[in-house]
């Protein structure tokens, strides 16, 4: 008996010894960055760093000239670092430290110094420039503008006596107005009565020629410029000690006129002139920045949109048809919108008019509209292309969109896309008496949402959150669960009792074609669906959010080298149940596979998908003038932003990337649907 216990003891000791020799391997912390070191020039710009890590990460490093957008995140998230113009006179360097557990990665950013200021001899009273006409129409009035200037000789202090706004009307090139605030500053004239402006003139501060680029001239008849509209935009840097002139074609009379400084340059203007004659004028001919419509948003008290939840009141003016058509509205609400896109420097917005409008010939008459920024989409057309594919595939509703130039509070913000708001309404989603939902990875941040029995997050978009009843919430939740359960049932392919009883197959497959042909990594990260009151089925659509499509995501590049569909490879999904649902329908239901081929062939042959690159060329021509201005405002053609896998430095090269992708995708997707 003693021997037996002794043997048991030896066995136990042997087991513990073996365990000690073979410990469980702990998870190794890891973190890496898309870039470790960057050297940039002295100009204002934004850098984007993508973090890959084994878990959550934190970021440290604080600089007043290089500000990071977030302090923590997860693997795959991007950090934006906004860098101000370097006017310090010397090179400067910032080091940011990323930590994931015990793993550390650093990012080093070096900004070169700006050009040295030329030493200028003191200039006597400036004689009239021979190119500066002695025009009796040169206007005078009360000088108005930003209250405070900056005194560079006294530690950049706030001043009302040094470098003031009066200097721009003193006839001298060696004096200038430099505002204390870096942005949202201006200078102009109160003319005392309405004038038709025929010409404007300007000259940059000596040595600061580039600071006039994208300055905006505006006219108004309210002293707070709440009714201001543009009359000219400066497209190029200036020349030292030179007046630059522009003839103005705007038939409206203005009492107040002003020069609005570009962002982050403190005006830095030497001379300013306005020409014209008294007159009420009319709105028969207004000014557009480019061939695209110009959208002007003047927010009450000049407030800036800084959040998505707070609505600000504004006056909105949409100038189109070469300046001969004007939509003017008051009491329009504006706020931020978007998820990841809201963190970009170029912000997206939502407008809500006080009355229903149909801007730019839109099919819907509605209050709610969106302004998409397309920040990471350098051809500025990927959403427009996705909508075109949607139309050619034959989805029931495709959102209206039109590219526009956007001005907010007198500042040019870039080329945007005016779009429908996705909602259940006449001319939009045909579900006014039914339901509109969104399979949505961000549903948890919404007010009205549910998680399905299989863990799929779903936001209820209609009925609205302030109108929906508990009974309605329960009904659509239960119905979605029934649909999902039917897809995963053993008899799910049964034509009468299977999933097609709850889910419209054609719209599901058409949405699939748009997402997979278009190369959208996030097709099933966000999916709109609506329940038609007539037949009771869930329909899929509309398509939305295609910034990352058409080869614009490093996570799936190169798409046409993937062996399988994107959703089954590296695509983002709101839940694994969604991925499995798509597989069961598209790959494992013989009738659905056959129907997918039919819809694809129809879209190619009758819908004209094979000619989609002609649409790319048309869009590029339409956007030619606007994109030039946009990338002067947002200098990112040489930068990786958001999920970009490349930075080509050229708009034309970015467009060619899209065309090359489409050519290859036509062949690859045809192979996939027939596999």
Give the ranges of each region predicted by the language model.
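A short beta-strand micro-motif common to beta-rich folds, especially ectodomain repeats
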Residues: 90-102
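A short beta-strand element within beta-rich, extracytoplasmic domains
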Residues: 195-207, 259
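Disordered, acidic Ser/Thr/Pro-rich linker "stalks" and the adjacent N-terminal cap
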Residues: 120-192, 205-211, 278-281
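Internal "kinase-insert"/substrate-recognition segments embedded within catalytic cores
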Residues: 297, 352, 357-358, 373, ...
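Middle-to-C-terminal accessory/interaction subdomains
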Residues: 303-305, 329-331, 338-340, 344, ...
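Surface-exposed binding patches on compact interaction domains or structured appendages
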Residues: 30-33, 52-80
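Trp- and acidic/polar-enriched beta-sheet ligand-binding modules for extracellular glycan
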Residues: 146, 153, 181-184, 208-279
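Bacterial Sec-dependent N-terminal signal peptides
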Residues: 16-39, 100, 106, 110-137
């Amino acid at each position: 008996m003693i021997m037996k216990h002794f043997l048991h003891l030896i066995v136990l000791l042997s087991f513990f010894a073996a365990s000690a020799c073979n410990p469980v391997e702990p998870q190794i912390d890891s973190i890496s960055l898309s870039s470790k070191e960057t050297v940039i020039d002295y100009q204002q710009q934004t850098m984007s760093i993508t973090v890959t890590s084994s878990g959550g990460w934190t970021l440290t490093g604080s600089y007043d000239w290089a500000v990071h957008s977030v302090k923590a995140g997860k693997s795959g998230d991007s950090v934006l670092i906004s860098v101000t113009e370097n006017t310090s006179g010397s090179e400067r360097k910032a080091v940011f430290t990323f930590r994931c557990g015990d793993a550390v990665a650093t990012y080093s950013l070096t900004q070169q110094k700006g050009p040295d200021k030329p030493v200028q001899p003191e200039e006597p009273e400036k004689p009239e420039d021979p190119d500066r006409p002695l025009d009796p129409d040169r206007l005078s009035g009360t000088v108005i503008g930003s209250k405070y200037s900056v005194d560079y000789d006294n530690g950049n202090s706030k001043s009302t006596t040094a470098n003031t706004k009066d200097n721009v009307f003193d006839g001298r090139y060696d004096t200038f107005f430099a505002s204390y605030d870096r942005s949202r500053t201006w200078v102009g004239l109160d003319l005392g009565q309405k004038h038709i402006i025929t010409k404007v003139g300007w000259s940059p501060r000596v040595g600061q020629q580039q600071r006039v680029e994208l300055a905006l001239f505006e006219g108004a008849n309210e002293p707070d410029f709440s009714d201001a509209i543009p009359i000219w935009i400066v497209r190029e840097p200036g020349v030292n000690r030179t007046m630059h002139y522009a003839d103005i074609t705007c038939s409206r009379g203005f009492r107040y006129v002003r020069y609005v400084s570009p962002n982050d340059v403190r005006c830095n203007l030497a001379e300013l002139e306005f020409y014209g004659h008294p007159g009420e004028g009319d709105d028969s001919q207004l000014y557009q920045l480019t061939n695209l419509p110009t959208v002007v948003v003047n927010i009450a008290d000049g407030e800036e949109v800084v959040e998505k939840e707070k609505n600000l009141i504004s006056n909105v003016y949409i100038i189109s048809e070469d300046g001969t058509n004007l939509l003017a509205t008051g009491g329009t609400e504006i706020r931020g919108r978007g998820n990841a896109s809201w963190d970009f420097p170029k912000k997206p917005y939502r407008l809500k008019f006080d009355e229903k409008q149909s801007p730019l010939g839109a099919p819907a008459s509605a209050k709610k509209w969106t302004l998409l920024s397309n920040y990471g989409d350098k051809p500025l057309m990927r959403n427009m292309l996705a909508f075109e594919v949607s139309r050619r595939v034959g989805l029931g509703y495709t959102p209206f969109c039109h590219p526009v130039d956007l001005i907010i509070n007198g500042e040019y913000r870039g080329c945007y896309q005016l779009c429908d708001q996705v909602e259940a309404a006449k001319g939009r989603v045909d579900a006014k008496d039914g339901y509109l939902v969104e399979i949505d990875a961000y549903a948890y941040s919404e007010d009205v949402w549910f998680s399905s029995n299989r863990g799929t997050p779903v936001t209820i978009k209609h009925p609205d959150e302030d109108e929906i009843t508990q009974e309605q919430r329960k009904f659509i939740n239960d119905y979605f669960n029934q649909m999902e359960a039917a897809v995963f049932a053993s008899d799910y392919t049964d034509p009468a009792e299977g999933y097609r009883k709850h889910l419209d197959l054609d719209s599901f497959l058409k949405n699939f074609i748009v997402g997979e042909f278009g190369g959208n990594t996030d097709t099933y990260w966000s999916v709109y669906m609506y329940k038609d009151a007539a037949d009771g089925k869930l329909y899929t659509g509309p398509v939305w959010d295609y910034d990352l499509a058409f080869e614009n995501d490093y996570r799936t590049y190169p798409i046409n080298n993937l062996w399988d569909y994107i959703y089954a490879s590296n695509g983002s999904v709101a839940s694994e149940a969604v991925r499995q649902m798509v597989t069961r329908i598209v790959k494992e239901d013989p009738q659905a596979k056959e129907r997918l081929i039919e819809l694809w062939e129809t879209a190619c042959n009758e819908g004209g998908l094979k000619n989609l690159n002609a649409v790319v060329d048309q869009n590029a021509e339409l956007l030619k003038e606007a994109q030039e201005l946009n990338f002067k405002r947002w200098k990112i053609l040489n930068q990786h932003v958001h999920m970009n896998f490349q930075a080509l430095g050229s708009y034309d090269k970015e467009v060619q990337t899209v065309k090359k992708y489409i050519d290859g995708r036509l062949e690859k997707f045809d192979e996939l649907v027939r596999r």
